[in-house]
Amino acid sequence: MKVSATDSQNVTAGFILKDREENILVEKSLQLNKENNHLEGTICVDLESVRLWDNHNPYLYHAYVELKAEDGSLAEVIPYDIGFRRIEIIDKVVYLNGKRLVITGVNRHEWNARTGRCIGIEDMKADISCMLRNNINSVRTCHYPDQIPWYYMCDDAGIYVMAETNLESHGSFQKLGAIEPSCNVPGSIPQWRDAVLERAKNNFETFKNHTSILFWSLGNESYAGDDIEAMNVYFAEKKDGRLVHYESAYYNRAYEDTISDFETRMYAKPEDVEEYLNNSPKKPYILCEFMHDMGNSMGGLGSYMKLIDKYDMYHGGFIWDFIDQAIMVKDPVTGKDVLRYGGDFDDKPADYEFSANGIVFADRKEKPAMQEVRYYYGLYR
């Protein structure tokens, strides 16, 4: 544990670790000496045994960090629940706590049908409950950091998090469906580097203590260049035991060895996944987006899930997406609540129902597609 503080006097840092029954397992202290008005120190503890955190048993310990003034008076206490888990790649296969990791995930936008992107605690609780009920064990925070309480809920519930950095520049390298990166940003443009690194730093520093975060994602659909490579270096240098994810290096193979711990695709066909895994694969494989659930979709989920049993290096993926983005309004004729999408407000141009890709409606009622999700994801609980 590292303690960093700013104070005008020398202080003592204390660390207390308790189990759920409030039994004290560790109690240590460290004198922090002032240097240039900055206090810093590291407390190391050894535990003979711990209960490991995962989706099946999200066991959290109660940690307390204390700061005491020179006279012994208590200046500050920070309580924080922490878990113990290890994620690693061995022989190109990802393991969590020594067991092969299988992702049964979803991409999740923050959405409420009445308040838009301003969601509340009850929305988050409903989403956690829905995920657990339907065998969803992972969430990608597409394509930006979520509200802070969400990460605490994932810690408590055992939901694995791919914490995505707030970055997407889709239109700068894909034009009319074709890959054309001549105007790509951030690319390798020096003026953009500090901006994207600041976003990576914001993501890391805000959420670095959350047990549920297994992966840092560098962003979404922004091609690949020196700037995103620098983001990868930033997270790798933190050596926090997490893995780094980024999809769009697929389009620029010059960076395949320096960006992302995964081979990761979106909407690759099952045979495309197999083609990679059958031809000297370099990295473990996940689908950061698959099963685009627009309309009466989700029928092909089983063909992807079979790959989990066939290839150890295939680790599953994240369905696109969790919840429709639609707005609840009163129907002018019937007076009833109805959900409306792009184009329903005489807005042109519009993407029409393209915001309706969820496995739940915008009012959080489950769609029929959820039955398919519950069944196939349940096979890998």
Predicted regions and their residues:
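Hydrophobic faces of well-ordered beta-strands that scaffold small-molecule active sites
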Residues: T104-V106, V139-T141, V161-A163, L218, ...
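Catalytic metal-binding/acid-base residues of hydrolase active sites
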Residues: Y144, N166, G219-Y223, D240, ...
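Generic structural signal for helix capping and beta-alpha/helix-loop junctions
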Residues: I148, H170-S172, Y223-G225, N252-A254, ...
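Active-site neighborhood of glycoside hydrolase catalytic domains
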Residues: D156, N184-K282
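Aromatic- and acidic-residue-enriched segments that line the glycan-binding/catalytic groove
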Residues: Y151-M162, F173-G187, V233-F235, E263, ...
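Substrate-binding clefts and catalytic carboxylate motifs of secreted carbohydrate-active enzymes
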Residues: L197, L214-W216, A230-V233, D272-R381
